[in-house]
Amino acid sequence: GSAYPAWGPEPWKADYTPWRRQVPAFLCPSDSQPIQDWANGRSPIAKTNYGFSNGDSIQGSQNARNNRGMFAHSSCYGISDCTDGSSNTILMGELVRTQGGLTMLGNTAIIAGTDTDPTLCRAALDPNNKNAFVAGTEIRGWSGDRWCDSNSSMTGFNTVLPPNSPRCSNDTWDGRWGIYSAQ
C-alpha cells in the first residue's frame, strides 16, 4: 500500500480511502445528488453540504493574514476569539452541490474581474432566469465537491454577496479567491 502523511495527503488524492468515505452527517437529508459518479466526470472524493465562513473579503479569503472569518488556512480560532459581539453569528452555512448545466445552484462561474468587482458576478446571471448563468458562461461544479478540501470554493463561503447569490471566481483553479456565496 501507499504511505501517507499524518492527516492524509492532498484532498484531491482519490486513492486515499478516507477521502472517498462518505460521512452521512456531512450531507443534508434533502440532497439527492449522486455522491460518486465516475461516468459523469464527478470526483470520487466524498461530498458535503456544509461550509465554513471565510469572512467578507474576496481577495486573500484563504490567507490567514487577510481572512476576517472564523476559518482560515493554518489558523485556529475559538469562540473566545470572537470579541465584536456579532462575529460568531456567521460560522457555518449550507452549500448546494452542483446541479449541472448553467444553473447557479452549486456552480461557480468563471468571470474575469470578479476578484475586484463583485457586480460582475451578478451580471453573469441570465436576465430571464436569475437562477441560471447566461449561455456561454464557463462553469465549475466545486461547491461541496470534496469534504476534505479547505479551499473556499469547495467547503467555504464568504459574505461578499448575500446567501443564495451566485458563486464566481476569476480563474479556473479551485484554489483561487472568489465570491463563494452560501446557497
Q: What is each residue range found by the language model?
A:
Residues G1-Q183:
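Internal low-complexity, small-residue/proline-rich segments
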